[in-house]
């Protein structure tokens, strides 16, 4: 299932007046509560939100819609988020899109596995408002145009 939700305030896309507060963000998350919270936080910050509930739909949306940032759940049904991220990073059409892992994994070595798959950062669940937006803003500011 895929939804495209505009930001609450609207805004231009990466033109002369683009800012990191107006990004197109793809969320790949199968948990409805986590998805709803992420959508709310992103829209409240002025971002346009695209959503997918599995990795395959996320890969298709990433190729077709070219988001500014992808938030990828690690534990997805079927193909997991690390495998999907590795595929995104091997594809010339999507390799430059920053991917931030959304994960409840907090064991020693998990960050290394997440980075090795190609993720540019990660956010631990449960999502904390300030940490969530700080990581996203940092990635958007440093992402290539």
Where are the language model's segments positioned?
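Conserved acidic carboxylate
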Residues: 29, 53
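Charged docking surfaces used in two-component/phosphorelay signaling
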Residues: 36-44
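Hydrophobic alpha-helical motif in two-component signaling modules
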Residues: 62, 71, 84-85, 89, ...
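Active-site residues of response regulator receiver
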Residues: 73, 103
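The feature encodes the CheY-like receiver
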Residues: 77-80, 95, 107
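C-terminal output helix
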Residues: 127-136
